[in-house]
Amino acid sequence: MSDGLYTRTWGDHGSRVVLCHGLFGQGRNWTQVAKALATDHRVLLVDLPDHGRSPWTDRFDYLAAADRVADLLGDEPAALVGHSMGGKVAMIAALAHPQAVERLCVVDVAPVVYPDGSEFEGFVAAMRDLDLASLQTRDEADTLLSPAIPAPTVRAFLLQNLRREGEVWRWQLNLDVLGDDLDTIRGWPEDAVAALDPFPGPVLWVAGERSDYIQDDHAATMERWFPRVRRVTVRGAGHWVHAERPAVVVEVLRRFLAGASAG
């Protein structure tokens, strides 16, 4: 734990790498990648605010989350890696605290406002409709979610947030705040970062080939904030690049962390 955020560490030597998960995720989503990188690095898995074992907030705020992550880094600059929502947190942390971030990897997200109508509204509605008071088992929860969320892998991802405490089931994540603040999470705090300088360090921008989160017309905005950016597309991967192509992500990250061109 540091500044209230829950963390797990893999590896005991080498430079530091901090991994930030996406919406509805937890640090442990990156465990496979962390274990592979831990042969040469100290890897920190973070549960972001309102997720996993980290504290809840009253409203989701990208700048506040970025400040909390920067506090983890302290006086030793680290490589910061973030996926989706965690990628936006990582980008803002690098812009607001450039002295704390040695290099940055942004996975399948851009510093832009995304349109309404994403699948996450459906996820939130289905999770809110689940009657936790009468729920008996996790398998029952899976069955009840299946009409609204047909993909078993997505249900399994969401249900990792379901915890049993005694006889009572509860969501470990802050479902109400995350659901109410989806517009904020889809957004980009342009006004809040407008006065900040571009990040001077190297940046790796990883896109999933089958994902539409990174578009060609996002490049100019990305280059405005991160002039040393290099883009890599992972073939066959959708939005959850690190889960779908972990070996490729590990190799790309190893090269980037070693200072080599990952292009």
Q: Which sequence ranges carry the predicted segments?
A:
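Active-site loop/oxyanion-hole signature of alpha/beta-hydrolase fold enzymes
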Residues: 5-6, 31, 35, 44-82, ...
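Active-site glycine-rich loops that stabilize anionic/oxyanionic intermediates
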Residues: 22-25, 84
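Serine-hydrolase catalytic-loop signature spanning alpha/beta hydrolases and amidase-signature enzymes
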Residues: 24-32
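Gly/Ala-rich beta-loop-alpha elbow adjacent to hydrolase catalytic centers
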Residues: 82, 86, 90
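Flexible "cap/lid" loop of the alpha/beta hydrolase fold
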Residues: 92-95, 102-136
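Conserved alpha/beta-hydrolase catalytic His-Asp/Glu region
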Residues: 133-187
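Conserved serine/cysteine hydrolase catalytic core
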Residues: 167-225, 230-233
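Catalytic active-site module of serine/aspartate enzymes centered on a nucleophile-bearing elbow/loop
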Residues: 227-263
